[in-house]
Each structure stands twice: as C-alpha cells, then as structure tokens.
Amino acid sequence: MLWSWYMSNDTQFYALAIIILLVSVKYFRVAAGAVIFFLVSSWATTIMVSLHYGYRARIQDPFAMFDELYDKPWTRLGPYLVGMFAGWFLLRSKNKIKMSLSTTVIGWFLSLATLFCLVYGLHLTTLEAWGSALYVSVGHTAWGAALAWIVIACCTGYGGCINSALSFRMLQPLSRLTYCAYLVHPVIMVATSFQMDGPMHIHNALTLILYFGN
C-alpha cells in the first residue's frame, strides 16, 4: 500500500506519545527531557543518513532517497513532537493567552515566511552536502512549528481572517473526509494508471485535471 509508511509511523508515534504523556503526569521534567532528546536525536540521525548517502536537496526531485530519508520514523518524529507540545500548551493554557500586537505580527510573519521558504526556498538553488543535511533534518520540524503557530494563534483569538477561513462551516464536511481521501485516492490513481495504454504527456490542462481530481 502506498500509504503504509505513514500509517506505520503514525502508529509508532501514537504509542510513544501515550508513554510520554503518562510519564508527564507525575514526572514532567523527565517527559520534557525525553521530548527534547527524541527531537535532537531525530535531527542528528537524519543529518548522518543524509551525509552518508550524499543527499542533495533539489526541488526537481523532492522524493529522492524516499526509503532512506522520507518515510523512516526516526526522520519524521520532529513535527509529531511539535504537535504534541502545541496540544499540551493549548490544554494547559485553556486557549487563553495574552500576546502583544508586536508578538502576534512577528509570530505570523515567521510562520508564513517559514512555510514559504520551505516550499520555494530550493528554487534555483543548489545546496551542498551539509546544507542539504540541515534542510532535510530540520525542514519537517520547521513546517510543523509554523503550522503549530497557526493553530495556537487561531485557538487563542489571534487568527483574524485566517481563523475565519479555516473555521468556515462549509469546510467542516470536507475536513472530515481528508484522511479517507488519503487512503482511497492512491488506489484510484494506481487503478487509473493500470488502464493507460501509453505514457501521459504533461501539459497545463492535464495538470489541472490531475490536481483537482486527486
């Protein structure tokens, strides 16, 4: 199954999260230390794997070394830990925190800038070995941190128009179907590919059809 790597990672992270959260009830510092340890270990492991295989981050080949770097749990743990912290923070603060205007503006700027740089930062850029290692090790965690800010800001009253858009009631049915679509659509895509009698010739119209259809 095309999505089995994700389900495997999610299951392992869920089991690890239960243990950490149970420990945090009585030994919070131990749990916090474990989170920091796992986060730093994930970064270090990803850097070592990237340097070992001579990985070069390129926007033209985003899934290079998929089996070595992309789908392994020890390289994907960072954003899950960030999400755990965001959830714990919202629970402890009861969605009630006070931020100054400058803090809010800086937070939104850094969040959106991080998302933009992670998506488009490799355009017309060639990273060397160490640059690629740092990018692939911290990139997923930085993406999770940027999204965590959006969640925290929206839940605490600092989301503005973005919170209004994300909370739009008409989108709620679609949001409940996203995981189902993730599980079903690869099967449809593979079945469609098996029905083809020749290669596809990519052009703008076909790209739009495939994008909105999948």
Could you describe each region identified by the protein language model?
Residues Y6-A15, A34-F38, R176-V184, Y211-N214:
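Transmembrane alpha-helical segments and their boundary/interface "anchor" motifs
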Residues R76, Y80, M84-A86, I106-N214:
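Alpha-helical transmembrane segments of multi-pass integral membrane proteins
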Residues M1-W5, I19-G144:
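Aromatic-enriched alpha-helical transmembrane segments of multi-pass intramembrane proteins
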